[in-house]
Regions:
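Alpha-helical transmembrane segments of integral membrane proteins
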Residues: 3-17, 304-311, 315, 337-340
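Short hydrophobic helices that act as membrane-entry/anchoring signals
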Residues: 19-22, 26, 180-187, 191, ...
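Membrane-embedded multi-pass helical conduit in multi-pass membrane proteins
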Residues: 37-45, 309-391
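Non-transmembrane catalytic domains and loops of membrane-associated enzymes and transporters
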Residues: 38-296, 426, 432-444, 448
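Membrane-interface alpha-helices
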Residues: 41, 84, 385-409
Length: 449
């Protein structure tokens, strides 16, 4: 039985060494760098690019959607802004009507109603194909934006080498429970450590869906690949943000992180919902890591360390924990070396995070160690064994409207709102100061049968 103790100790020691190198290097590269902003003389001028905000919506809570749209409508942006709200076959459309009607006099808003649920990816594409802005900002329907998010992201995207950029995510419902507080800390780490370090080399590996901006010219060149993603010969319908980011990097574009562009999103408030989300994300990460491996030779060596740290680290920890538990069960001997190293790493890690964030609340992140070991590690193992499963896992069981092939586009012409008929005519609206564009027909939107 000494073999189990040896395996556990060696594995946890290797894990500690890898974590020290990986997290230490990450902390160095995650330090804020100075990025020059657009000069003040450009503000209010015609040099600001046009931006299309696309908001896919499926069975969203009306109050949550209203908050999202209000935050977009009040963006402090000097350029043309147009908003496309895509209802992806929601079963609660009647409850959303008052939310839509609040913007019937705003010429920047267009509402697209798909005949059936086709998934977030195709809902995005429906709006992308009929919009024309220089940049596309994808926003989740449960997310609210700080007033300068569009401006901050656009400033960073002025470099033509940048294909995508994401903002900093926080939990809008952070104070609801211990779990939402913990997830908010997870988001801070994911953004201000992981993404910030990757952005130092222009290679953010996942521009998160709640708030991500794309250069239209880059996006259109990748749209067919994005729409038809397959895994083991089957359509892959989730992890769209990570896959699109990898496609951007594969095409030679830079991907960035903008911490000043803050977006607040609703996070799971129950353990069951949280684990479903983590399972979906784990499958997506494993799938696209296989694609990302081919990119590593063309990226900075730090990204290789990043991939190793995120994949080999959990494996070493799992081996250490399993061997330690086996030792405890079979010999009644506690794996004290393993437990001591894990406890020490947890204390040091939380103290460093609290110091970097200047927030004592991160000392409570120690709770995450237990969740990681006893829930997330087994979940990742299950995800690895079920990679071909493309179930979204979070779709609410609400009756969907009758199936239809063509979407209905409800546009707001300047001065007078109009609702299109089911048969197809629609009116494409203009931005705040954009010249009137051509009328868009509903059959120009590609929705799945």
């Amino acid at each position: 039985m000494d073999l189990l103790a040896t395996v556990s100790t060696v594995a946890i020691s290797c894990y500690a060494l890898l974590s020290a190198v990986y997290k230490g290097t990450q902390a160095v590269y995650a330090q804020p760098s100075t990025i020059t902003s657009m000069s003040d003389d450009l503000l209010g001028s015609d040099l600001w690019p046009s931006v299309d905000v696309i908001i896919p919506c499926y069975n969203e809570n009306p109050r949550t959607l209203a908050a999202c749209l209000a935050s977009v409508a009040t963006q402090e942006y000097a350029g043309d802004l147009h908003v496309y709200v895509v209802d992806d076959g929601s079963g609660n459309r009647d409850t959303l009507v008052p939310v839509h009607h609040a913007y019937v006099d705003d010429p920047r808003f267009t509402f697209i109603q798909l005949g059936k649920n086709v998934g977030k990816r195709k809902a995005q594409i429906a709006a992308i194909r009929i919009s024309s802005g220089d940049f596309v900002l994808s926003v989740d329907s449960d997310t609210t934006l700080e007033p300068e998010v569009v401006t901050k992201l656009t400033e960073r995207m002025r470099d033509p080498a940048i294909g995508a950029a994401m903002g900093q995510l926080v939990a809008s419902n952070r104070t609801d429970s211990w779990l939402t507080r913990l997830i908010d800390m997870e988001y801070w780490l994911a953004c201000n450590e992981e993404r910030a370090a990757q952005a130092r080399f222009g290679a953010v590996m996942c521009c998160c869906g709640p708030c991500a901006m794309y250069r239209r010219s880059s996006l259109l060149s990748l749209l067919d690949q994005y729409e038809t993603q397959l895994f083991r010969g089957k359509p892959s319908d989730f992890g769209e943000d990570r896959h699109l980011t990898i496609l951007m990097l594969k095409a030679g574009f830079r991907t960035e992180y903008v911490p000043e562009a803050v977006a607040a999103t609703v996070v799971p408030d129950s353990l069951q919902a949280y684990l479903r989300q983590q399972l979906r994300w784990a499958r997506s990460t494993f799938r696209d890591t296989l694609l990302a491996l081919r990119l590593l030779p063309s990226l900075d060596r730090y990204l290789t360390l990043d991939v190793i740290g995120q994949n080999l680290g959990p494996l070493l920890l799992a081996i250490a924990v399993l061997a330690g538990l086996a030792e405890l069960v079979l010999t009644n001997n506690a794996p004290w070396p393993t437990a001591t190293i894990i406890a020490g790493m947890t204390v040091i890690r939380c103290a460093v995070i609290a110091f970097r964030a200047h927030q004592l609340r991160f000392l409570g992140f120690a709770v995450h160690t237990f969740i990681n070991i006893f829930l997330l590690l087994p979940l990742k193992g299950y995800a690895l064994c079920t990679l071909s499963n493309s179930d979204w896992l979070s779709r609410k069981s609400v009756s969907v409207p009758p199936e239809g092939k063509k979407p209905i586009i409800i546009a707001n012409p300047i001065g007078r709102p109009t609702v299109s008929s089911v048969s197809g005519e629609s009116h494409h609206t203009t931005g705040r100061s954009r010249a009137p564009s051509r009328l868009a027909r509903s059959d120009s939107v590609h929705s799945a049968d």
